[in-house]
Amino acid sequence: MGKIIFYDDRNFQGRSYDCMSDCSDISSYLSRVGSIRVESGCFMVYERNSYMGNQFFLRRGEYHDMQRMMSMGMIFDTIRSCRMIPPYRGSYRMRIYERDNFGGQMHEVMDDCDNIMERYRMSDWQSCHVMDGHWLFYEQPHYRGRMWYFRPGEYRSFRDMGYSNMRFMSMRRITDIC
């Protein structure tokens, strides 16, 4: 199991909230998050309640202040929810599709891909089926830009999920010992 502690001030000061599972509304415990300590496991933190908005991946470590987190690539300054990423040690496998509802060109993916356009000759893809493992998708090649967490399941339409103007350009397996 994982454990993440949110503090309302920088440098682990002020009130705190200990979390060992998913939390859809951190603001019911703290009015703001100034620093974070991940004692064990891996977590996705979200800009809005109910796991919505921009996301950022956190592994075990200390995050002293939001300014430092923003310099690491986090593009938002509020954290309202978090999701624990369960430990996983199996194989990784997913299928990506050119169109909604698993239509069009399909590719099976089992490892990291730093540039989907170059490797698969796909400028865009609109649905996927994650069969095994936990993955991070990025909006730019080489694991840059905004990121999204995908766990096993069927994702029939990125547009219906609120990603209508989003193009995923790289993907990485979450292989950390979470």
From Swiss-Prot:
InterPro entries the UniProt entry points to: Beta/Gamma-Crystallin, Beta/gamma_crystallin, G_crystallin-like
Highest rank taxon of the organism = Eukaryota
Q: Give any Pfam family that matches.
A: Crystall
Report whether Repeat shows up as a keyword of the record: yes
Recall the GO molecular function terms of this protein's record: structural constituent of eye lens
Residue ranges annotated for the Beta/gamma crystallin 'Greek key' domain, each copy included? 2-40, 41-86, 92-132, 133-175
Task: Give the function comment from the record.
Answer: Crystallins are the dominant structural components of the vertebrate eye lens.
Record protein name field: Gamma-crystallin M1
